[in-house]
């Protein structure tokens, strides 16, 4: 499949000044620098070059599998560093794949950009009844921008429905305790990926500890002013499911510390009972 897509892209570049390509631009230098600083906390180093190549990120991903920290949590850091692939009427390299020419000519699914490429190739071979532009009534610039936009919309719809279904599922586990791993750190709390289920939830910063936490955006780390406790991506954390909002696809978690009573407090019980009643309305 990859070889066919490369071959088609090369043919397009030989016959047309503009076509339909799948491009992926390199990550910004600042994003790479910040990623390297975070990965060093886990003993992982990106290649010491000014502009890391795709193979350097691939080597880092391999090194991540040797870490005690869950792979998914570290992989997410790399993905956040990357730009999104998109469609373009101008031929540009595909950074993540490491290809100079790439397009979507064939795949397990049939996309509209594939059809545009087919029409262009037929035009080049002299067997197409219509050019890609005439068939769509749009310029290639407009087609590429439109296909990129609708792809983002489809991805967002997929994420939204997945989040709602996960929230609905976790609504059956209110008050239950789970082991998890910190998958994201923000100024307002941490996201925890549960070990038992492929689900992430938010532990609000007010639920972390009896302390005030300072957020280090560069190292993605929270540090307690009084306790000096540090919370970062990859840390293990025991949590309890406190509440869910199915409509918004949100899951609220509460941190369980060793000194905490494992039973549900009256305040938590009251809040959860109230949330359940609200969800039934």
Feature annotation, model-predicted:
Residues 1-195, 202, 209, 214, ...:
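Append "with occasional cross-activation on large, charged helical scaffolds in nucleic-acid assemblies
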Residues 173-176, 213-239:
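Short nucleic-acid-contacting surface segments enriched for D/E, G, S/T with interspersed K/R
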Residues 194, 233-271:
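OB-fold/S1-family single-stranded nucleic acid-binding modules
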Residues 200-201, 222:
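Glycine-centered structural positions embedded in regular secondary structure
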Residues 212-221, 255-281:
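Acidic, low-complexity intrinsically disordered tails
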């Amino acid at each position: 499949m990859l070889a066919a897509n490369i071959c088609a892209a090369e043919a397009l570049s030989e016959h047309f000044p503009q076509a339909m390509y799948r491009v992926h631009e390199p990550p910004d230098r600042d994003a790479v620098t910040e990623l390297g600083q975070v990965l060093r906390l886990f003993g992982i180093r990106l290649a010491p070059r000014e502009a890391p190549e795709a193979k350097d990120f691939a080597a880092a991903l391999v090194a991540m599998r040797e870490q005690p920290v869950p792979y998914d949590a570290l992989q997410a850091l790399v993905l956040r560093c990357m730009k999104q692939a998109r469609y373009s009427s101008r031929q540009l390299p595909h950074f993540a794949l490491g290809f100079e020419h790439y397009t979507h000519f064939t795949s397990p699914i049939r996309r509209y950009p594939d059809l545009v490429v087919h029409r262009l190739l037929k035009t080049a071979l002299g067997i197409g009844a219509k050019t890609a532009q005439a068939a769509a009534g749009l310029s290639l610039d407009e087609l590429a921008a439109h296909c990129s936009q609708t792809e983002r919309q489809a991805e967002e719809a997929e994420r939204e429905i997945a989040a709602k279904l996960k929230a609905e599922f976790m609504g059956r586990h209110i008050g239950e305790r789970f082991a998890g791993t910190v998958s994201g750190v923000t100024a307002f709390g941490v996201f925890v990926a549960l070990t038992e289920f492929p689900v992430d939830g938010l532990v609000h910063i007010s639920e972390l500890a009896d302390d005030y936490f300072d957020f280090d955006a560069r190292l993605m780390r929270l540090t307690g002013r009084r306790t000096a406790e540090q919370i970062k991506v990859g840390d293990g954390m025991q949590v309890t499911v406190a509440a869910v909002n199915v409509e918004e696809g949100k899951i609220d978690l509460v941190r369980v510390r060793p000194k905490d009573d494992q039973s549900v407090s009256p305040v938590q019980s009251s809040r959860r009972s109230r949330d359940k009643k609200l969800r039934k309305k």
